[in-house]
């Protein structure tokens, strides 16, 4: 996750919902925020990878321990204290934008495990299998507004949470770079996200890059007639003292992808 304050302000300007949250720079600030949001809460350190230093806490004692760890893990000493939305659907889109503001969606990814399990540990499918088409279009529209606002050139991973009972959608975070999810999306679709991002960074546009049956990349859309399922590989037995438990910190050491119809 990058700067949580900048991200929160940007989403507010766009009118895109987020989980209720506040930023803390000290343990005392985090304690005060958690009391207002009510336990349990989730702590998300800024500028970390794989959810390092964060986690869900159920009381003030747990908060102090995790917050101290998170502040140390964050490059800027910043932790987001966030309302708990565990159990919601977790949905991801891999999108690409060029300097002319052309935007395409490479892949729709549905996490089979709900919010609360890190995406790197979650079973997931591409394309989305249980999410209505109108919801997918809404997520795509939000993703395009986000990457246009922050002026991403290249690939970007956008992560959302959806309450299956009320339909409420919030954005959790984005990764404005080639990420672990980008690697999965590339393998699932055959779309070379990192390579294309490099070309776009050099000044080309999506319309300049040829792409098989689509003609050029600006006309690309995900239309595979197959399903991809990813599941994680863990190695708890190799790490002394490691707890065999999943949460907001990524535990997987690898992953396996299967393709079928």
Where are these regions (language model features)?
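ATP-dependent carboxylate activation and anion-phosphoryl transfer catalytic cores
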Residues: 14, 37-40, 50, 57-261
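A conserved helix-loop-beta module that forms one wall/lid of the active-site cleft
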Residues: 1-54
């Amino acid at each position: 996750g990058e700067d949580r304050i900048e991200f929160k302000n940007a989403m507010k300007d766009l009118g895109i919902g987020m989980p209720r949250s506040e930023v803390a720079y000290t343990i005392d600030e985090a304690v005060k925020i958690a009391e207002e949001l009510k336990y349990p809460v989730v702590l998300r350190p800024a500028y970390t990878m794989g959810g390092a230093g964060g986690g869900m806490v159920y009381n003030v004692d747990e908060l102090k321990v995790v917050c101290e760890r998170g502040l140390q893990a964050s490059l800027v000493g910043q932790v987001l204290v966030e309302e708990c939305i565990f159990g919601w659907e977790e949905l991801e889109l891999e999108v690409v934008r060029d300097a002319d503001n052309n935007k395409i969606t490479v892949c729709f990814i549905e996490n089979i495990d709900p919010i609360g399990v890190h995406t790197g540990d979650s079973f997931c499918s591409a394309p989305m299998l249980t999410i209505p088409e109108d919801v997918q279009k809404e997520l795509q529209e939000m993703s395009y507004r986000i990457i246009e606002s922050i002026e991403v050139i290249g690939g970007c991973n956008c992560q959302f949470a959806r309450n299956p009972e009320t339909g409420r959608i919030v954005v959790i975070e984005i990764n404005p770079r080639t990420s672990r999810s980008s690697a999965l999306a590339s393998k699932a679709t055959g779309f070379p996200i990192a390579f294309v991002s490099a070309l776009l960074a050099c000044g080309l546009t999506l319309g300049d890059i040829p792409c098989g049956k689509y003609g050029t990349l600006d006309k690309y859309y995900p239309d595979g007639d197959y399903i991809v399922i990813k599941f994680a590989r863990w190695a708890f037995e190799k790490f002394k003292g490691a707890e065999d438990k999943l949460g907001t910190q990524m535990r997987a050491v690898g992953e396996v992808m299967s393709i079928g119809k």
